[in-house]
């Protein structure tokens, strides 16, 4: 159990509890890994390495695989058309069978985006270490876990040893105090954080999100915030566990039961940053000042409130940042001074490991219910897992989506990244609930604006970047953010 000789942050407590060997003379520590998540893109070479060395997977019981990045979101009962995608998925299936790793394949009720599947199964728990060959592994930090992405060589190392050599991360406390206004969500919080500290502001840090606004978030909201810690340059993001965490986990398939549950909760309640602990850096935000947010450029830090205009690079003092803004505006085909609300879109994507859970789908559906999408705008709604999809259909969300004129898809990473059939055409502009807006991220030449599910829904209705606030002004009968339950 954690020793309390010195005041520690949450991240430091979890690190100490997983220390196998303390590094000396500048060498890294050796850290034990409790949960290893695997998908089809970053695992083939790792399994090949095991095969060449004649090594087994050391802890197949702590390893779980799912198919997500390359999977189609329509016609999942048909052969995968793209050769590369099909090969990667077939390779994962062979590797999982050969090495005894549990795999959730297409058609399995538990298949889906790896960072949705882990929490919904109760595999992600407070105080554990989680790794995956995917940068958005930070999602799992919402439970008070130390969770971070690793490269393919590290995937092999964990498969072989269930450990990783690592140097301790720095810690940054991000405190968000106050109450969010109706229509403002967890996605707006993290976009505001990234806009404040920049895409490199968290480099080398574990970010711990704190304050009354964070505590008021659901687990889905906390996962959204922690998910995009990587877009701030951080290694991981964490939220200390509390009753909200415990309520989410209780009764899930892999959560402890009976006396084991009581013992687990007793330990989990110790996973709080000590009052006297000192962060290496701290950032503070006022939740009441955060508005619905949107990115205008080609990195997640290039964002503004939706009520603002496209910024002028001339107002940016730092030369590299100014040059990046100029290039971003050219790629995005935007002019300085243009109101963000006047920017038209060709597509809306509702999905990704950032915003594809049942709460996200409910929020989106509550805004579009009884309405029709804007003419000429393609709207794609992709649940994060087969189980989320089934739950949404039981609530009638699929019917709301289809009556709205949108596409209701099967689970997968989908249009978050240009690695499967769901892509933008060159020049198309998309309001997306995903996490990255780099050049070509959603397809070669595609232009991405990162938004919340509520902004995505309002944008799909109006055809231009919009929030529920805009719908409220247009129609007195339109559901407001309060009625949406956000």
From Swiss-Prot:
BP-aspect Gene Ontology terms: L-leucine biosynthetic process
PROSITE patterns, per database record: ACONITASE_2
Cofactor binding note from Swiss-Prot or TrEMBL: Binds 1 [4Fe-4S] cluster per subunit.
Keywords: 4Fe-4S, Amino-acid biosynthesis, Branched-chain amino acid biosynthesis, Iron, Iron-sulfur, Leucine biosynthesis, Lyase, Metal-binding
EC id: 4.2.1.33
UniProt cross-references to PANTHER family, sorted A to Z: 3-ISOPROPYLMALATE DEHYDRATASE, HOMOACONITASE, MITOCHONDRIAL-RELATED
Function per UniProt: Catalyzes the isomerization between 2-isopropylmalate and 3-isopropylmalate, via the formation of 2-isopropylmaleate.
Protein name per Swiss-Prot or TrEMBL: 3-isopropylmalate dehydratase large subunit
